[in-house]
C-alpha cells in the first residue's frame, strides 16, 4: 500500500484533539441518564426538532434522564439550517430555567443548535459574535456539559468541533467552533436510526462519505485523520445500500453510525473541501437539505478534484471495494469518481435543479463558495472559474471528463 505522504504536509504543525467521550452500541440509549448524571448535570435542556419529538424518538432519552433524577427542560423547536434567532431563543430558555447541561437528540441541526446554545450560555453576546472569521471573537470558555445523541448517520456533529449556524440577514451559513464547543459525551445507538426513511438514509449517508473523502484528500490531512477517514469510507461504502434497502438492518445501521462518527473525527479542527464550501454557502441562500445538497455535488466535485491527489483517489477506489489491481493510478482514481456518480443514481438523490436550485445562480454561487474557509483545504486549487465548472457539471451543462 502506498502511503502517499507529501513533504509539504509533513512540514506543517499539525494538531489533533478529541474532546468527546464516545460510547456506542445497540441499546446504548438506556445508559443516557447515568452517563449524563456523571457529567454533573442535574437539569438538562433537551434540544430536538418537532418531528423527532412527535415521533417519540426522544422518549427513551427523556425517560432515562428522569430515572436518573435529572430534570428535563424541553426545547423542541429546531429547524433545518438553524438560524441565529433560534439559538438566541434556546439560550434564553437555558438561562431562564437555570439549566446546567445540554442533551441534543436528532440530526446535525439539533446537535449544532445545542452547541451554539452552549456558546451563548458561557459567553457574552450572540453566537454571531463568535463566527470563525477575521475580526470576530474566539471562543474562550468550555460550553456546559453537552451530550449528543444522533438519530441520523451523516453529519458527524456528535463528535465534530464545529457548529454551522445560519445568519438570515446575510443569507450566510457560518462556522463557530474549536475544541471548546465539542460535545463532552456522545451516545450512539443504531436503534434510534431505524425509523429514518430511505431518502434520509441516502442523503445523510452520502454526507458522511463526503466528510471522509474530503478530509482524506484535503491539504490539511494528517496520518490520524487519514486512518479514521479511510475506515469511514469503507464502512459507508459497504453498508449504505443495505441501510437504504432495509432500515431495520441493525448491522447496516450500526456500520453507518460508525462511518458518520469516524468521518466526523476526520474533520479534527481543520477544513474540508469544495463540496462542503458549496453546500454551506448554497444552504445560506436557499433552504436546501444539507446532506441532499452535498450528495448531488459529490460526483462533480470528485471529478474536478481527483487530479489534485490521484494517489489518494485511487486509494479511495479500493476503500469503495473496487478491484484496482490491474488499473493505473489514474484509472483507479477515475473509477472512484464513477462509483460515486453511480451511488448517487442508485440511491435516487434528486439533482440540484430538483432541489430548487436554478442554473441561473451559478455565477453568484461560485463567488459565495470562494468566500468559504473550506475552499482552502481542497486538494486541487480553486477559483471562481473552477467552481463555475463544478456547478455546470452539477447541472449537466458541460461534458463529463471521466
Curated annotation (Swiss-Prot):
What induces its synthesis? By choline and by high osmolarity in the presence of choline. Repressed by GbsR.
Q: What keywords does the record list, in alphabetical order?
A: NAD, Oxidoreductase
Its pathway is:
Amine and polyamine biosynthesis; betaine biosynthesis via choline pathway; betaine aldehyde from choline (dehydrogenase route): step 1/1
Please write the reaction equations for the catalytic activity of this protein.
Answer: choline + NAD(+) = betaine aldehyde + NADH + H(+)
Q: What happens when the gene is disrupted?
A: Deletion of the gbsAB genes abolishes the choline-glycine betaine synthesis pathway and the ability of B.subtilis to deal effectively with high-osmolarity stress in choline- or glycine betaine aldehyde-containing medium.
GO-annotated biological processes? glycine betaine biosynthetic process from choline
Instruction: Report which superkingdom the organism of origin falls in.
Output: Bacteria
Keyword flag Zinc:
no
User: What EC numbers are recorded for this enzyme?
Assistant: 1.1.1.-
In Gene Ontology terms, what is one molecular function of this protein? Answer: metal ion binding
What sort of enzyme, by top EC class, is this? oxidoreductase
The SS bond pairs are none
Family the UniProt entry places it in: Belongs to the iron-containing alcohol dehydrogenase family.
Q: What does this protein do?
A: Involved in the biosynthesis of the osmoprotectant glycine betaine from choline.
Name by which UniProt lists this protein:
Choline dehydrogenase
Q: Which organism is it from?
A: Bacillus subtilis (strain 168)
List the taxonomic lineage: Bacteria, Bacillati, Bacillota, Bacilli, Bacillales
Amino acid at each position: 500500500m502506498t502511503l502517499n505522504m507529501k513533504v509539504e504536509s509533513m512540514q506543517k504543525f499539525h494538531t489533533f484533539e478529541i474532546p468527546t467521550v464516545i460510547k456506542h452500541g445497540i441499546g446504548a440509549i438506556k445508559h443516557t441518564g447515568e452517563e449524563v448524571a456523571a457529567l454533573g448535570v442535574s437539569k438538562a435542556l433537551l434540544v430536538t426538532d418537532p418531528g423527532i419529538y412527535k415521533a417519540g424518538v426522544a422518549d427513551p432519552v427523556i425517560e432515562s434522564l428522569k430515572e436518573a433524577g435529572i430534570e428535563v427542560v424541553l426545547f423542541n423547536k429546531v429547524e433545518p439550517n438553524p438560524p441565529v434567532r433560534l439559538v438566541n431563543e434556546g439560550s434564553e430558555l437555558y438561562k431562564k430555567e437555570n439549566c446546567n447541561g445540554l442533551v441534543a437528540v436528532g440530526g446535525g441541526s439539533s446537535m449544532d443548535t445545542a452547541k451554539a446554545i452552549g456558546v451563548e450560555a458561557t459567553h457574552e453576546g450572540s453566537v454571531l459574535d463568535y463566527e470563525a472569521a477575521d475580526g470576530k471573537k474566539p471562543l474562550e470558555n468550555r460550553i456546559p456539559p453537552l451530550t449528543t445523541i444522533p438519530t441520523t448517520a451523516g453529519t458527524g456533529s456528535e463528535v465534530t468541533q464545529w457548529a454551522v449556524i445560519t445568519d438570515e440577514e446575510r443569507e450566510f451559513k457560518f462556522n463557530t467552533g474549536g475544541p471548546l464547543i465539542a460535545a463532552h459525551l456522545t451516545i450512539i445507538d443504531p436503534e434510534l436510526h431505524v425509523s429514518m426513511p430511505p431518502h434520509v438514509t441516502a442523503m445523510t449517508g452520502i454526507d458522511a462519505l463526503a466528510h471522509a473523502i474530503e478530509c482524506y484528500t484535503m491539504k490539511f490531512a494528517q496520518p490520524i485523520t487519514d486512518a479514521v477517514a479511510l475506515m469511514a469510507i469503507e464502512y459507508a461504502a459497504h453498508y449504505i445500500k443495505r441501510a437504504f434497502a432495509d432500515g431495520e438492518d441493525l448491522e447496516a445501521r450500526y456500520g453507518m453510525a460508525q462511518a458518520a462518527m469516524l468521518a466526523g473525527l476526520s474533520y479534527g479542527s481543520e477544513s474540508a473541501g469544495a463540496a462542503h464550501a458549496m453546500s454551506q454557502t448554497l444552504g445560506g441562500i436557499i433552504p436546501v437539505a444539507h446532506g441532499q445538497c452535498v450528495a448531488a455535488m459529490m460526483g462533480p466535485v470528485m471529478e474536478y478534484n481527483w487530479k489534485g491527489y490521484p494517489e489518494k483517489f485511487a486509494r479511495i477506489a479500493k476503500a469503495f471495494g473496487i478491484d484496482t489491481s490491474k488499473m493505473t493510478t489514474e484509472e483507479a482514481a477515475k473509477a472512484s469518481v464513477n462509483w460515486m456518480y453511480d451511488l448517487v443514481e442508485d440511491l435516487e438523490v434528486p439533482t440540484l435543479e430538483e432541489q430548487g436550485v436554478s442554473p441561473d445562480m451559478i455565477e453568484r454561487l461560485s463567488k459565495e463558495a470562494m468566500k468559504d474557509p473550506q475552499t482552502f483545504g481542497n486538494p486541487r486549487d480553486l477559483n471562481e472559474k473552477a467552481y463555475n465548472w463544478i456547478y455546470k457539471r452539477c447541472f449537466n451543462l458541460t461534458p463529463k471528463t471521466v
